[in-house]
């Protein structure tokens, strides 16, 4: 009955406090960054940790890290709003707070920075990474002053893992990646079933808590955060049937509870499920082929990280997190291989991750691949240096209108640079300016242009040109040199910006298609969201 009571309180808090406390926190933070300019209501800084504490304290099968990450992000966002910062600055503060929350929970500053980069920042820039890194380092230092520098999860030092055994751990990672797809889809399938219930959603957590209580009665280890379970799995204390039961029941309990919309984290349950599954697979492999040298404890470590990599798509954060929290010196190669395999399987079989599926179902698109800005890599001189049709500054509108009506060569352009008698650029005029009925035929062109002219330099990037066009609300820019800023050498238009993408798209199209998720493996609920 205790989990049910806690779930009722959480449902009540969500109904009358804020519905944003539902879920595990990271998707909600991502959504605020992407679509709400990183503005998180101040009340969430209290409601989220309190609701999570009630949920976990009454037996909910969740980790505390998700709500802590969400709370840290909310604090950063609120601070940014108090200081009247820009949306970009609030995003950095939110990510710094979230990363600091993770670093303080596990003592894993590097993986916290990587998690912020892979899931929250949506960019890789010094202005973003440095504040996040400093926040994570500070949070870890504070943690060490209270609990010491011991790793979050105790694990004996294992022997060297090399040769053919690495292939075994890669295979384990692939199988755990397949399981991560099943876990993710199951959670959202259960959520879909709750949405069909003819009762208000504030009562759903109580229904989910019934399953939590029943399962917890028969297997108490499924209740609560379960960090002790992770310790026992990694140290090899749990084995055989116990591992299988814990893996299955923890998954059922957690997925039902999370699907019901209560408050709690996903990381610890994923680590428990993945670690137990990895240990079972490694033990099975060792029994079938003893010569491989598979170690169930290393299999547990790989499985723990691979489950997180497959479910969240945070590949580098998963690898480094497992290393930082266990300080297993010879675990990097198995971790990198296993997590990469899990990431690949998840990417091929599932369009969205456990972090982004909820956002996608609300009709929003979440970026999943990041690359250097192509426009930043192309200079204006590469596309904008060409002969330009110019107009003399002393021409009258009457002569220009007659020339354009004649459809003479060059007269069909939408904009024209205006050149003074000495050959210097004084501005740009458009067809709309020339044919404006409010301007008489006797007007001369010099009177129509703005001074000084808005120009772009030949050594600027196309990104600079695009930004300038947006800021000035114009569709073309004269190109000049820095040495001679009034001498026209070309022009660049919006069409040039679009055409600059053509080589990149042609080169990448075939490769990107090969990595697209397969519609065959997508469930109807996921298909309807895209």
Predicted ranges, named:
Residues 1-377, 381-382, 387, 392-398, ...:
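Alpha-helical transmembrane segments and immediately membrane-proximal extracytoplasmic
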Residues 364, 507-530:
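Intrinsically disordered or compositionally simple regulatory linkers and C-terminal tails
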Residues 391-412, 419, 436-441, 455-482, ...:
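The conserved cystathionine-beta-synthase
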Residues 320, 426-434, 489-497:
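Short hydrophobic beta-strand motif reused across regulatory alpha/beta modules
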Residues 421-424, 483-487:
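Flexible loop/coil segments at beta-strand boundaries within sensory signal-transduction domains
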Residues 281-308, 434-454, 458-461, 465:
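Generic long, charged, amphipathic alpha-helical segments
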């Amino acid at each position: 009955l205790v989990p049910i009571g806690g779930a009722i309180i959480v449902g009540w808090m969500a109904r009358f406090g804020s519905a944003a406390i539902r879920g595990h926190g990271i998707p909600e933070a991502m959504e605020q960054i992407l679509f709400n300019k990183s503005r998180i209501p101040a009340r969430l800084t209290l409601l989220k940790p309190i609701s999570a504490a009630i949920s976990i304290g009454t037996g909910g099968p969740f980790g505390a890290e998700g709500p802590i990450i969400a709370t840290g992000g909310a604090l950063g966002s609120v601070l940014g709003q108090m200081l009247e910062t820009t949306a970009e600055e609030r995003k950095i503060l939110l990510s710094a707070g979230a990363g600091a929350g993770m670093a303080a929970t596990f003592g894993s500053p590097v993986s916290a920075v990587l998690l912020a980069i892979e899931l929250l920042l949506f960019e890789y820039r010094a202005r973003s990474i440095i504040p996040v890194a400093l926040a994570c380092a500070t949070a870890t230092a504070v943690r060490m002053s209270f609990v010491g520098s011991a790793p979050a999860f105790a694990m004996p030092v294992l022997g060297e893992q090399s040769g053919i055994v690495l292939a075994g751990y890669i295979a384990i990672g692939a199988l755990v990646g397949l399981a991560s797809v099943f876990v993710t889809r199951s959670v959202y399938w259960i959520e879909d079933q709750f949405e069909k219930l003819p009762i208000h959603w504030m009562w759903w957590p109580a229904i989910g808590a019934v399953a939590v209580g029943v399962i917890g009665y028969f297997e108490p280890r499924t209740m609560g955060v379960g960090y002790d379970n992770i310790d026992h799995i990694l140290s090899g204390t749990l084995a055989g049937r116990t591992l299988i039961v814990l893996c299955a029941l923890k998954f059922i309990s957690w997925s039902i509870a999370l699907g019901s919309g209560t408050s709690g984290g996903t990381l610890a349950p994923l680590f428990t499920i993945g670690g137990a599954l990895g240990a079972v697979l490694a033990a099975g492999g060792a029994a079938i082929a003893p010569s491989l040298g598979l170690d169930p404890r290393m299999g547990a470590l790989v499985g723990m990280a691979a489950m997180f990599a497959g479910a969240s798509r945070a590949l580098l954060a998963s690898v480094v997190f497992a290393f930082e929290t266990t300080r297993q010196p010879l675990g990097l190669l198995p971790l990198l291989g296993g997590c990469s395999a899990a990431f690949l399987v998840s990417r091929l079989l599932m369009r969205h991750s456990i972090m982004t599926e909820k956002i996608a179902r609300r009709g929003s698109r979440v970026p999943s691949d990041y690359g250097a800005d192509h426009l930043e890599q192309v200079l204006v001189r590469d596309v904008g240096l060409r002969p330009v049709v110019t107009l003399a500054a002393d021409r009258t509108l009457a002569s220009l209108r007659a020339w354009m009506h004649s459809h003479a060569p060059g007269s069909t352009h939408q904009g024209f640079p205006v050149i003074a008698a000495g050959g210097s650029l004084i501005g740009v005029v458009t067809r709309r300016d020339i044919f404006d009925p409010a301007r008489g035929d006797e007007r001369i062109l010099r009177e129509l242009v703005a001074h000084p002219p808005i120009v772009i330099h030949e050594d600027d990037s196309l990104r600079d040109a695009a930004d300038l066009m947006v800021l000035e609300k114009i569709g073309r820019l004269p190109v000049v040199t820095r040495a001679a800023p009034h001498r026209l050498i070309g022009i660049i238009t919006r069409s040039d910006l679009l055409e600059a993408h053509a080589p990149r798209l042609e080169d990448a199209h075939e490769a990107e298609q090969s990595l697209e998720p397969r519609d065959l493996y997508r469930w109807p609920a996921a298909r309807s969201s895209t």
